[in-house]
């Protein structure tokens, strides 16, 4: 697997005119409900250029006062050389992004040579049924499934987190795109010494394995951001969040986008 810096160097080659210099989960589903169902997917500004597509949840795209890193990634690239198109939408898991047809809409626009960045997990952690608003995916990366009955009486066969990620990666690569699978961004959590705590241990391993099995690139975005948090004091980190500990504000989204680009 290529190093992180060599991977990002490939992105810089696509956007050689870089504009900006880069210097334990809750047992119950108490996250705020973010539902951007009415938000239309973005479209490339210039269809003939290479496109960097982004798929994710509200930590990648959301509305003020919350803001996801995908909304700030475009500032690091020259719009005359590459499109940056954010299809991420609040309230979605890998499961619901796929089953609602949002992945297919993104995939329809992908052409050979494009890049696709995918980050899910924050809405995959809950149960597969009503208690988590039918958003959770089956834990793991295997072929195990769960069948749930929806509120309308219809049944759904829910696949694993890894199944959805691998399906997205494989279908994008089949169209000639380069795929990057990212671990979820960290929560606002601290250890007993007040240092940023690492979380997502299971999910980070699952994403890495999915990348390996599909030929996608893997970026441990959780660790990249946490390393940069290590350089800050706790109040400085807390100031970059818009809620209890999941969603960033505009300062936090810029911080996370810079961490991704800087590597």
Describe the residue ranges of each PLM region:
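Residues at alpha-helix caps and immediate loop-helix transition turns in enzyme cores, especially N-
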Residues: 65-66, 98-99, 252
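Alpha-helical cap/lid subdomain in secreted, periplasmic
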Residues: 102-250, 254, 258-263
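N-terminal secretory signal peptides that target proteins for export/translocation
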Residues: 1-4
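Sec/Tat signal peptide C-region and signal peptidase I cleavage site
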Residues: 22-26
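Bacterial N-terminal signal peptides
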Residues: 9-21
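A generic structural signal for short coil/turn motifs at secondary-structure boundaries
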Residues: 61-64, 94-96, 189-191
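Serine-esterase "nucleophile elbow" of acetyl-processing enzymes
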Residues: 27-90, 104-116, 132-140
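N-terminal post-signal-peptidase region of extra-cytosolic proteins
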Residues: 93-105
